[in-house]
């Protein structure tokens, strides 16, 4: 299992081998038309970018990955453990019209629906069941991680589409790593309250502070939900400011990364 880097001209994005049966990507900063602090592949619609730039960025990425901009479905991310089932009727939500629902996970079993979640240090998790032909996407900030959003997305796929956890493949994308995610005690306390002693493997004390491994914590949740095929990116968004946006590093003066997954049509 591994993440792969794809380059087409100036465009760069990542994919995971475990999701090869679905069109998907984890974006980087490279290959768009946005300028300044948003240079260049900004995919966020509320970052102060020109709408035509954002649309062109989606079009460029979509041509390479295999989705159309109008197929995307966004959500209002609120650092929750809420997951919503969506379908073709929801396509365009967020890009062509406002995303109304405050949830942090999306699932579907309909081809032509490009589930889209945003990050700039938070953990993006993409899910694919090639047997039941269903997909999921979860945005896991530290609060969502503590609340088990990744496991909740797996449970939604079981409930809505009859997926078996052992058939679900998961890719945990680039986010702030344990090298850079320094926190006060509230973050590790929340993880231990949710995961017990198992959380300890992802928490490193450093004096009065702590360094926390969000990717490992989300992998723990996925394994608890019954998922065994888990691919984890080695990239830290805060360590690579030229390649990824990091809220921890630059605050609000930044663009947004996106993780996108779409079922391909059969046949």
Q: At which residue positions do the language-model features occur?
A:
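Active-site microenvironment for binding and transforming phosphate-containing groups
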Residues: 1-267
């Amino acid at each position: 299992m591994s993440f792969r880097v794809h380059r087409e001209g100036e465009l760069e994005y990542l994919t995971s081998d475990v999701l090869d049966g679905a069109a998907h990507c984890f974006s980087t900063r490279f290959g768009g038309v946005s300028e300044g602090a948003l240079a260049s592949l900004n995919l966020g619609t509320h970052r102060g970018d020109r709408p035509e730039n954002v649309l062109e960025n989606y079009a460029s990425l979509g041509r390479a990955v295999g989705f159309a901009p109008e197929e995307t479905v966004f959500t209002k991310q609120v650092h929750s453990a809420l997951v919503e089932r969506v379908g073709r009727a929801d396509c365009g939500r967020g890009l062509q019209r406002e995303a109304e629902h405050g949830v942090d996970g999306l699932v579907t079993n309909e081809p032509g629906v490009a589930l889209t979640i945003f990050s700039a240090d938070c953990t993006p998790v993409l899910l694919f069941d090639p047997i039941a032909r269903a997909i999921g996407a979860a945005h896991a900030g530290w609060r969502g991680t503590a609340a088990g959003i990744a496991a909740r997305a797996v449970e939604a796929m079981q409930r809505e589409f009859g997926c078996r956890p052992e058939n679900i493949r998961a890719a945990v994308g680039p986010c702030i790593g344990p090298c850079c995610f320094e926190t006060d005690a509230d973050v590790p306390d929340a993880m231990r309250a949710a995961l017990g002693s198992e959380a300890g493997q992802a928490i490193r004390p450093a004096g009065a502070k702590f360094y926390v491994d969000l990717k490992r914590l989300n992998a723990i949740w996925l394994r608890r939900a019954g998922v065994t095929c888990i691919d984890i990116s080695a990239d830290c968004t805060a360590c690579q400011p030229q390649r990824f946006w990091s809220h921890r590093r630059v605050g609000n003066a930044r663009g947004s990364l996106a993780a996108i997954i779409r079922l391909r049509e059969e046949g």
